[in-house]
């Protein structure tokens, strides 16, 4: 399929980080609001906010976020940022998106976690009204931070549960802060009633995927380390887990050292549930259309495959059953003319 046709396909995205997905125009607006100087030249600015095609590691990739952090410290900035990412998604026919962010990273200048979430939800709502997309929020704890900080944030933001906030996650340094370290807090938070997704297996540790599944988590981000792990793949499928795959990002961070090391084909051939995601639109210089192009190029993914993956994404999404039903109907209708071809 040509790029224009891939762009027209209806899409769902489950794994998109707010601070890693801001457009250059919005970064300029945010910098002006924060009174931070940025390069006038777009290519120079892009270099500051985009990770190299090949990073030494995940931690090298994550350094790129340091530039954005000071720009997301006010309600106005957070609302603008959330609206921007929803707009970008809608313009490439994403009908459903879950945008994740860590309130802790926007609390440097006095905002509370509740205020951060409120501001982000306001931006999501503006984008939904303007573009006809459904956009929800996932709150992340940072793995490398004190568990008490994350515990307090998770408890405080519960007032937004099912008012746009639909789930929780842990992001950051997976290698040194595995699921075992987070397990008690994850169990506590699950008891509140909102589901968890979790970055797992991005650092080359299959046992972290095992631990996440054993915590009852039904969606896992990346799962790159499941490659060539036959027993783990069987466990993944038996537990009805959905993978949030991030191809470009995984190649950058060396989670997958080569295309052949990326687990998509093994997951697909085994019948595992999966979704295709950007991870970070700006940091990885990508969007869903570009990701779809890469899947066609490297894996010969078909329109029928994309429909199936998007159906998996919506079914595994954290929105309400009624909204899932409406989104699935919208998705199926959007693909009818392409499938007939």
From Swiss-Prot:
It catalyses: adenosine + H2O + H(+) = inosine + NH4(+); 2'-deoxyadenosine + H2O + H(+) = 2'-deoxyinosine + NH4(+). NCBIfam families: aden_deam. Transmembrane segments: none annotated. Substrate binds at residues 17, 19, 172. Pfam families: A_deaminase. The lineage of its organism: Bacteria, Bacillati, Bacillota, Bacilli, Lactobacillales. Its EC number is 3.5.4.4. HAMAP family: A_deaminase. GO terms for molecular function: 2'-deoxyadenosine deaminase activity; adenosine deaminase activity; zinc ion binding. This is Adenosine deaminase. Binds 1 zinc ion per subunit. Keywords: Hydrolase, Metal-binding, Nucleotide metabolism, Zinc. The active site is at residue 202. PANTHER family: ADENOSINE DEAMINASE.
């Amino acid at each position: 399929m040509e790029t224009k046709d891939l762009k027209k396909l209806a899409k769902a995205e489950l794994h998109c980080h707010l601070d890693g997905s801001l457009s250059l125009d919005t970064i300029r607006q945010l910098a002006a609001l924060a009174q931070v100087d940025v390069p006038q030249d777009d290519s120079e600015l892009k270099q500051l906010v985009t990770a190299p095609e090949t990073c030494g590691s995940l931690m090298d990739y994550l350094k790129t976020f340091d530039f954005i952090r000071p720009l997301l410290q006010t309600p106005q900035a957070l609302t603008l940022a959330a609206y921007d990412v929803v707009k970008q998604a809608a313009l490439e026919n994403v009908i459903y998106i879950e945008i994740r962010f860590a309130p802790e990273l926007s609390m440097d200048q006095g905002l509370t976690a509740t205020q951060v979430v409120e501001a982000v939800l306001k931006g999501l709502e503006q984008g939904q009204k303007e573009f006809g997309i459904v956009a929800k929020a996932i709150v992340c704890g940072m793995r490398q931070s004190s568990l008490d900080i994350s515990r307090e944030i998770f408890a405080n933001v519960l007032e937004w549960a099912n008012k746009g906030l639909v789930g929780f996650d842990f992001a950051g340094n997976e290698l040194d802060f595995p699921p075992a370290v987070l397990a008690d807090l994850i169990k506590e938070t699950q008891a509140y009633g909102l589901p968890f997704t979790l970055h797992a297996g991005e650092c080359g540790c299959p046992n972290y995927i095992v631990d996440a599944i054993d915590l009852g988590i039904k969606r896992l981000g990346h799962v790159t380390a499941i490659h060539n792990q036959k027993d783990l793949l069987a466990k993944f499928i038996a537990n009805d887990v959905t993978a949030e795959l991030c191809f470009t990002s995984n190649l950058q961070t060396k989670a997958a050292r080569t295309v052949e090391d990326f687990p998509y084909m093994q997951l697909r051939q085994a019948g595992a549930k999966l979704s295709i995601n950007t991870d970070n639109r700006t940091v990885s210089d990508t969007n869903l259309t570009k990701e779809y192009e890469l899947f066609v190029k490297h894996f010969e993914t078909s329109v029928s495959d994309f429909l199936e993956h998007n159906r998996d994404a919506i079914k595994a999404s954290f929105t309400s059953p009624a909204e899932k039903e409406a989104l699935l109907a919208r998705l199926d209708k959007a693909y009818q003319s392409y499938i007939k071809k």
